[in-house]
């Protein structure tokens, strides 16, 4: 939240052009292209559009290359929580509750795991199910490796118990989550999707800049026939799925309009439950069994609340070239609007500040990860638990004692608001235990 408030947005101009190109029937169709770079100032954008008024546009180069997309690994606890939030709108706690019911009824394997490995039984079952439903060309058995920091891999990845069972009986939530798990698991054992990506470079006769038009066509759908991975709403996905009309090198193009739109850099996105789980996993904080309880606890104690940000109005500039005339327009947009994000409360801010001041070592992101590593050493018999506890309390206990001794000088959870204008005495607010 502090990074967001401290963020300074920077403006630039994104230039897009719509060209009219004949299709296979000779009918003119629209083709979108984007300038290869962002322009830093309005004056620079204005100057480019002035050049375009009298310019000739020519296809300078066409490149076509094959592209392969591979499926994601089967679900771990973390990735299941993230994908269920994005695709189904489930909270982290809701996902674990439904997964628990599926596990207890024998529908899926254990749902608290950081492993992406599948047993040979599951791989063979997937292979058979894919071949029966879609044919042998869709089969591609795979073994995945876990890349998460501190992963223990005590269990298999989350998968259906019987791969041939595509649907189950149960509640609507159970059916949805099972369907998600089944598709993800099946897709992980399917062939790559094969695509062809085409990029056309368009030159401007009186300027050094170029426009790029890109298109993508699926040659073989592979795993995409079953499953497409979702992304957080704050991750911008390029729209390259459109097809390009027939083009040839040296072809002259006619523009319909060219637009320079003022755009702004965005502040770091606030966390959703799903993106917070991903961050916890990246930092090595906690285990699959603790992600959901951690996120629930900080909300129950009102350190964090889930809510929406309405956003603010912002003016932005649009310069348009159409029919050889340049128009300059100022428009309004809403920026910063966010839905279902985790927002820190005043209580959470005060508690965090207090802990950062008096217990910085425990608040360090590496603390939990290092403790988890020490637990692993205890489990493997390399270290005695008493040694680790003594080392920890040797520094922790004095910190607690010194903090208690100082609490009369600075009350726990206390924030100074200022001086009373009548009495001149300091006014403060104190927050209770939680």
Model-identified regions with their sequence ranges:
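Eukaryotic nuclear/nucleolar intrinsically disordered, charge-dense low-complexity regions
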Residues: 105-108
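Residues within the DNA-recognition helix of helix-turn-helix
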Residues: 98
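Conserved alpha/beta core segments of nucleic-acid transaction machinery
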Residues: 42-71
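C-terminal helical "lid" subdomain and adjoining coupling/linker elements of P-loop NTPases
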Residues: 1-44, 87
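Basic, low-complexity terminal or inter-domain segments flanking catalytic cores
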Residues: 3-6, 12, 45, 63, ...
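A conserved hydrophobic secondary-structure block that centers on an alpha-helix together
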Residues: 81-83, 87-95
């Amino acid at each position: 939240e502090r990074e967001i408030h401290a963020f300074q947005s920077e403006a630039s101009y994104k230039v897009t052009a719509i060209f009219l190109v004949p299709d296979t029937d000779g009918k003119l169709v629209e083709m979108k292209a984007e300038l290869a770079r962002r322009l830093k100032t309005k004056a620079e954008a204005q100057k480019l559009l002035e050049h375009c008024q009298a310019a000739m546009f020519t296809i300078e180069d066409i490149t076509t290359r094959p592209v392969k997309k591979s499926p994601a690994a089967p679900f771990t606890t973390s990735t299941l929580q993230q994908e269920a939030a994005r695709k189904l709108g489930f909270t982290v706690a809701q996902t674990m509750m439904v997964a628990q019911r599926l596990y207890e009824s024998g529908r899926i394997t254990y749902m608290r795991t950081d492993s992406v490995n599948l047993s040979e039984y599951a791989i063979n079952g997937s292979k058979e199910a894919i071949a029966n439903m879609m044919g042998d060309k869709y089969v591609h058995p795979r073994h995945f490796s876990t890349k998460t920091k501190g992963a223990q891999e005590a269990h298999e990845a989350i998968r259906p118990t019987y791969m041939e069972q595509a649907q189950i009986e149960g509640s609507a939530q159970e059916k949805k989550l099972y369907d998600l798990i089944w598709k993800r698991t099946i897709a992980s054992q399917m062939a790559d999707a094969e695509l062809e990506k085409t990029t056309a470079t368009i030159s401007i006769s009186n300027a050094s800049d170029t426009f790029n038009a890109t298109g993508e066509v699926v040659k073989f759908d592979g795993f995409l026939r079953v499953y497409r991975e979702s992304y957080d709403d704050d991750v911008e996905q390029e729209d390259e799925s459109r097809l390009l009309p027939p083009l040839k090198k040296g072809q002259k193009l006619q523009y319909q309009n060219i637009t320079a739109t003022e755009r702004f850099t965005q502040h770091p996105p606030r966390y959703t439950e799903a993106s917070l789980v991903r961050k916890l996993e990246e930092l090595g904080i906690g285990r699959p069994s603790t992600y959901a309880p951690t996120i629930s606890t900080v909300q129950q104690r009102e350190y964090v609340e889930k809510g929406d940000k309405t956003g603010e109005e912002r003016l932005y500039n649009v310069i348009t070239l159409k029919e050889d005339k340049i128009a300059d327009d100022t428009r309004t947009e809403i920026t910063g609007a966010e839905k279902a994000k985790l927002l820190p409360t005043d209580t959470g801010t005060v508690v965090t500040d207090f802990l950062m001041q008096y217990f910085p070592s425990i608040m360090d992101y590496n603390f939990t990860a290092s403790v988890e590593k020490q637990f692993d050493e205890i489990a493997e018999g390399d270290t005695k638990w008493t040694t680790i506890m003594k080392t920890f309390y040797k520094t922790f206990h004095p910190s607690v004692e010194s903090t208690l001794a100082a609490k009369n000088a600075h009350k726990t959870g206390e924030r100074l608001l200022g001086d009373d204008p009548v009495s001149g005495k300091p006014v403060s607010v104190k927050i209770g235990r939680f």
